[in-house]
């Protein structure tokens, strides 16, 4: 059976390849000093008995849904959007970091960023940040 904690560690490892981030968290921190990335459970966090075409383990396949929060700067900073743009597209993007190893270090069968769900003001705890929320699907048996 897939190991949820190991998958989160694999995601964190891939995000740590992005230049410019001060830190990557696989749990929601009490305090974040941007630029950072945070891995949080998506909705629903886990789906069991998912099928993929040509899968021999269709009854065991699980889909793990995550949100990757990229917090570029405090919301009011003028340069925050330019920093954020590089994380949502281009060679230094979150998409390319995950695509660089879709097995997340061997913990998953496949992983893919499916969309940028939000771009703009992101509230984490009591702080407002210019950020983006990216949806990540991870498939594992």
Where are these regions (language model features)?
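Charged, amphipathic alpha-helical segments and their flanking helix caps
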Residues: 1-33, 43-141
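A short glycine-rich, His/Asp/Glu-containing loop-to-beta-strand
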Residues: 35-39
């Amino acid at each position: 059976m897939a190991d949820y904690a190991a998958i989160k560690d694999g995601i964190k490892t891939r995000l740590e390849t992005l230049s410019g981030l001060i830190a990557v968290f696989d749990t929601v921190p009490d305090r974040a000093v941007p630029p950072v990335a945070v891995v949080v459970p998506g909705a629903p966090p886990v789906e069991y008995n998912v099928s993929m075409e040509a899968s021999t383990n269709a009854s065991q396949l699980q889909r793990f849904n995550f949100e990757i929060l990229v917090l570029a700067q405090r919301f009011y900073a003028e340069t925050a959007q330019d920093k954020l743009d590089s994380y949502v597209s281009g060679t230094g993007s979150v998409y390319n970091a995950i695509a660089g190893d879709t097995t997340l270090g061997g913990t998953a069968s496949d992983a893919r960023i499916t969309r940028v769900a939000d771009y703009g003001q992101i509230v984490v705890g009591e702080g407002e940040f210019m950020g983006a929320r990216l949806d990540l699907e991870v498939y594992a048996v």
